[in-house]
Amino acid sequence: YSTSFKKDLKVISNNAQKLQKTVEVLGMLQECGVEGIPRKMKPHKLIGQYKGALECHIEPDLLIIWEEYLDEREISLLRLGSHSELFKK
């Protein structure tokens, strides 16, 4: 995980519900990668500054961004936060 992700996680750690949902999604990612994420969470590839990374909605305005390395069966956690926090213009 990136330094930014660690900071983002610290910000939501005071909200038990968001933290629990985030931990559940991390478990899905660890187990099955993007294939483990339910369609209702809208997993998709990103363009722009996060080109090549993937994103899904933990809540309507709580997103997680990660990169997936299929050869090594690894993921790299990049960011966690709201649309406005992650996609500032």
PLM feature segments, named:
Residues I65-W66:
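Acidic, metal-associated active-site segment
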Residues Y1-P60, Y69-I75, H83-K89:
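Basic, Lys/Arg-enriched alpha-helical interface segments
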